[in-house]
Amino acid sequence: MSESDETKSISSLISSSSSSRPKKYICTYEGCDKAYNRPSLLEQHLRTHSNDRPYKCTVEDCDKAFFRKSHLETHIVSHSEKKPFHCSVCGKGVNSRQHLKRHEITHTKSFKCTFENCQEAFYKHQSLRHHILSVHEKTLTCKQCNKVFTRPSKLAQHKLKHHGGSPAYQCDHPGCFKNFQTWSVLQFHIKQSHPKLKCPKCGKGCVGKKGLSSHMLSHDDSTMIKIWTCDYCDVGKFAKKNELVEHYNIFHDGNIPDDLLKETEVKKLENLLDQGSKLNNLHELETEKLKVEEDEEDEEDSLDEKRSDVRSDSMSAQRSIKSFTASLEGSKSVSKLISNSGKKINCPKNNCDRMFSREYDLRRHLKWHDDNLQRIESFLNSIEKEETPEGEPLVKKARMDLLPNETSVISR
């Protein structure tokens, strides 16, 4: 036997011996029934209850600390520009084996067909569903000419074009027998007329029985590969990252590993800052909104009101954070601003070129500024409560960029 074979044999024996040991080292914390076969593993677990993080990063200006030495070693790599682990498919570099495993799974076809003697697999769950409907269940086959389609919409279009007949889409809600020409109109009808059906496992609302049946496949272990694994226990294996985060919150007292915490919190703040650099059309959007409000203020039927709400929500979502990056000018009173009747009134905030002819419009516009400042203030306060070293510079930058110290110029 060669030296390498002997080493592998010894390693397998050690692993086998370790896994067969009785788990007699039990956690003494109330409500926790975890048990381990080594005292060192129990000691490691107890740190998650006491939040004792003995392994501290030695890099300057980094205060990170960890429960495990392996976590610290992985973190140290993040300070280096070199990426020790590289994808065998595309060559992308990452910091750890776990990150590499998560990345490489994106190159694999995770959703496999469960029908006997079928080896097909797909990158997306939707593609698997279309495959099952068209190939195995034959529900996407035209009964008149036997032509097979990959999507219900394609089959419906084919029937209307080549075979005529009544509308192809029928509502399957109990007691409803309405038919529709297109799939989108049917979906609109279901959303407006029938309540969503909740998934018994996750509570997600689904449109119709078919929508619920399709969603339930996402909970089927046989059709999904679970790539998100818990660092603390062998039970926690999930197909989605948010499910793993929820597992940490429920079963491990919210002790989320630093890589996941960094992704969820810091990314959220980065997205907020990105809004300010990408959206530069605030003036045109606000002008359009005011014009619509003035023209349609007196008469609007129910449909117009819905469209106005959607348009208003869309504009609100697109409002640029850039309008808050400059401090306010000196204390200009409204009376001074409108002293010359009939002239345009400028918004007193820097980097905002809006102009108004009425005091009412100016006040409403400035209230919009204040409301958004309060929203951003609330968000930054929530981030600071659970601030991490990675997130700290972003929070400070956001405060300097987004929240000026001066107060509003309008006295109410």
From Swiss-Prot:
Residues 9-20 have a biased composition (Low complexity). One of its GO terms (molecular function) is RNA polymerase II cis-regulatory region sequence-specific DNA binding. Residues 293-303 have a biased composition (Acidic residues). The keyword DNA-binding applies. Keywords: DNA-binding, Metal-binding, Nucleus, Repeat, Transcription, Transcription regulation, Zinc, Zinc-finger. GO terms for cellular component: nucleus. Transcription factor required for transcription of 5S rRNA by RNA polymerase III. This is Transcription factor IIIA. The gene is PZF1.
